[in-house]
Amino acid sequence: MDWNRVEGNWKQVKGKVKEQWGKLTDDDLDQISGSREQLEGKIQERYGIEKDRVRRDIDDWYGRQTWNW
């Protein structure tokens, strides 16, 4: 997984993140600014999911995406 590409294209990616994790606010997404660690933390906070599960969910989500870099 090349998370650096996600960080570098965050403005385009955050819409897909919002579709998957709708409880994240626009302010959350702006604050995350592409940081995987911050995304994990916000998902944990909003959904009450343990860290290992959040990591797996993000990996699964990332693998399902069609990226047009």
Swiss-Prot record:
Q: Which cysteines are joined by disulfide bonds?
A: none
Under the heading InterPro entries, the entry gives: CsbD (IPR008462), UPF0337_stress_rsp (IPR050423), YjbJ (IPR026042), YjbJ_sf (IPR036629)
* A Pfam match: CsbD
Keyword terms, alphabetized: Plasmid
Gene3D superfamilies, per the entry: YjbJ (1.10.1470.10)
Which family is this sequence assigned to? Belongs to the UPF0337 (CsbD) family.
Matching entries from SUPFAM superfamilies are given as:
Hypothetical protein YjbJ
Taxonomic superkingdom: Bacteria
Q: What is this protein called?
A: UPF0337 protein RB0906
